[in-house]
């Protein structure tokens, strides 16, 4: 479907059952045309609004990561079940390269190509575009399970989530009161500068979960992207922009306790910084990630 053709969202669908994170930051839309196992059969759309913005009034990198993750799961999951929506796709790993800035206002679009489907895994790659411009390239691996099995696990976990204790932030962390519109829309986060990076903490909320009742992969990457740009800015004193991001999902999280992430900046120069981090919840490692950040001089205040 050409990006320059007006999009009739009435011909598109949203996930059923509802996905709290996608509904909160989206909605995200998709349409399947023809054989879901073929390249280009799945077309995804994210209408962009002010809440998706970063400091430069472009679409936040975390929003693009979340949309790429959505597209990966759609392309890989529907290839695994032939378009029947009987599979639940969970991201194992994903890599995204940012090629251009997305503007707030026009919709983002994504499509992809299933590469291989095995008994447990599905591999796919694709792109995110806007008005004919390629904004990002993505590739990744999903694990696919029966949707009925994933929903049963959600039902088992619901009582524990409803009895979760109030969450608190340790002393020494400062609220990021001037965070970007997208980051604030997701929820408050707190930071502490380290000698070689930063540590960030974010209390979790129900809208950060996916339809399976665990923390959404797009949410975790959104938090990680905010963390790497914050750490790069604190260490270098320059304005950061993510140009590449890769993540490996190690375990599932839930909305009962805060997430924390320690970001290191092993090396940086005048124009690039290289970062890595680990996202944890109550000592459990959930996400390992790395990023390349473009640096530029900050505009005079």
Positions of predicted regions on the chain:
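Terminal targeting signals and extreme-terminal segments of soluble enzymes
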Residues: 1-301
């Amino acid at each position: 479907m050409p990006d320059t053709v007006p999009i009739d969202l009435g011909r598109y669908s949203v996930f059923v059952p509802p996905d709290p994170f996608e509904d909160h930051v989206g909605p995200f839309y998709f349409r399947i045309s023809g054989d879901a196992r073929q390249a280009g059969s799945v077309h995804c759309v994210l209408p962009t609004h002010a809440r998706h913005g970063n400091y430069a009034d472009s679409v936040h990198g975390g929003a693009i990561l979340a949309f790429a993750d959505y597209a990966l799961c759609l392309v890989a999951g529907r290839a695994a079940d032939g378009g029947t929506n009987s599979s639940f796709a969970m991201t194992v790993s994903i890599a995204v390269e940012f090629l251009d800035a997305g503007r707030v206002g026009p919709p983002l679009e994504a499509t992809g190509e299933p590469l291989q489907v095995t008994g447990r895994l599905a591999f796919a790659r694709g792109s995110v575009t806007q008005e004919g411009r390629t904004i990002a390239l993505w590739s990744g691996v999903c694990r696919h399970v029966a949707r009925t099995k994933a929903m049963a696990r959600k039902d088992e976990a619901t009582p524990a989530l409803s009895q979760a204790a109030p969450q608190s932030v340790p002393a020494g962390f400062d609220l990021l009161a001037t965070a970007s519109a997208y980051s604030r829309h997701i929820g408050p986060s707190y930071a502490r500068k380290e000698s070689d990076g930063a540590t960030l903490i974010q209390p979790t909320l129900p809208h950060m979960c996916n339809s399976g009742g665990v923390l959404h992969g797009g949410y975790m990457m959104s938090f990680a992207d905010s963390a790497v740009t914050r750490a790069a800015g604190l260490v270098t004193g320059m304005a950061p922009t993510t140009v590449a991001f890769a993540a490996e999902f190690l375990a599932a999280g839930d909305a009962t306790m805060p997430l924390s992430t320690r970001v290191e900046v092993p090396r940086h120069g005048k124009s690039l910084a290289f970062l890595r981090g680990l996202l944890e919840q109550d000592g459990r490692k959930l996400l390992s990630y790395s990023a390349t950040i473009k640096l530029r001089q900050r505009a005079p205040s």
